[in-house]
Amino acid sequence: LVGSEMCIRDRFNAHLENKEAIEQRQEAIRELSTDLEYRQQIRLSGLLYKGKPADTSEIKEWANSPSYYRKHRLLRMIPATVSVINLLCISLTCLDILPASIAGGVFACFVVFSSVFSKGITKLQATYGKKLQILSTYADQILLTEKKDMHSPVLQELKAELTSRNQTASQAVRRLSKLMNALDQRNNLLISMLLNGLIFWELRQVMKIEQWKEVHASDLPRWIETVGEIDAYCSLATFAYNHPEYIYPKINSHSFHMQAKALGHPLMDRNKCVRNGIDIDKRPFFIIITGANMAGKSTYLRTVGVNYLLACMGAPVWADEMEIYPARLVTSLRTNDSLTDNESYFFAELKRLKLIIDKLEAGEEHFIILDEILKGTNSMDKQ
């Protein structure tokens, strides 16, 4: 799902720096990694309709937008009034009190009158109809989570978010999905004319959708975010399941200590990867990596950075043992120049270094990885 992809991306960009939060996330990932059936069901339901990146944000925007039709009292009365008039005309016609031509004329007038609202309803259907197809996927995933017993505190909190007033979240979301799918019946011109002439069906249907929105306007964005969070946990749990030899690192919150044995890069071939250790526990807390070209210095730095990031996300790492002090990871591994911004590679690296210095001087704690900084520039210019 798009929501889960955003959650995973956010976890990479803004990883945890709190020991308790990381350990709680480790517990949640451990729990889900043992439930293969649940994760496969979540994965399968998410593949049915993944949606587009803009879908979830536009659905949230729709949920927070004011109702258009229900805010007018007169418009709210129209469907019921039309239904009563048609029922009266049909009854009088059956009793031979009213000519059928008059009843037919009234019906035709209502068909024409209903077309006044068609443009706005068509716009609503065109804008959100396809996007709300993803709601059935959310409903399926919510239902799976509602039925599952959660044990870790993090997962219990997420499950508690999937609540509503007098019905489950899955029932509420499925109700909206059915309302939007029913609105598609207006694409059948014959049925649309018949229902609009009799009960102003399109306007009635849109008002039901707006009524749902008024009740669950604050719930829907929360449910979407919660489903994305759970799906993201399932992705990390699948990563843990696929690598049973990986270990969950120890988190140290007292003083800086970065120590690991036999670190390996998760993307490298396990048969070819040369695993190395790291140990930083003494002031001034830095190490310098030197060696010949193509000796693997950059790969080593990336290995340390990737595993450190995974550790701060609560995920397992490829190591025999590992202990970290969680801090913000800052790197200068792939600095790029920019012709449009008139920035050379050298200037871009200087800006990055200035940013790091400013953060450190502000008292922020960081784990910093620099790879061949200011390379390609002679020593005099570097000074």
List the predicted regions and their residue ranges.
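Long, charged/polar-rich coiled-coil alpha-helical scaffolds that serve as structural arms
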Residues: 10-37, 54, 130-133, 225
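Interdomain "pre-motor" coupling segment immediately N-terminal to P-loop NTPase/helicase cores
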Residues: 219-241
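ATPase nucleotide-binding head domains, primarily ABC-like/P-loop NTPase cores
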Residues: 114-117, 236, 242-383
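Short, small-residue-biased leader/transition segments that mark boundaries at the very start
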Residues: 1-2, 6-7
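Membrane-interface, cytosolic juxtamembrane amphipathic helix immediately N-terminal to a transmembrane helix
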Residues: 24-85, 212
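Coiled-coil heptad-register positions
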Residues: 37-40, 146, 231, 238
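A conserved P-loop NTPase coupling/switch region
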Residues: 65-227
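Structural signal for well-ordered, non-membrane alpha-helices
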Residues: 139, 143, 231, 354-357
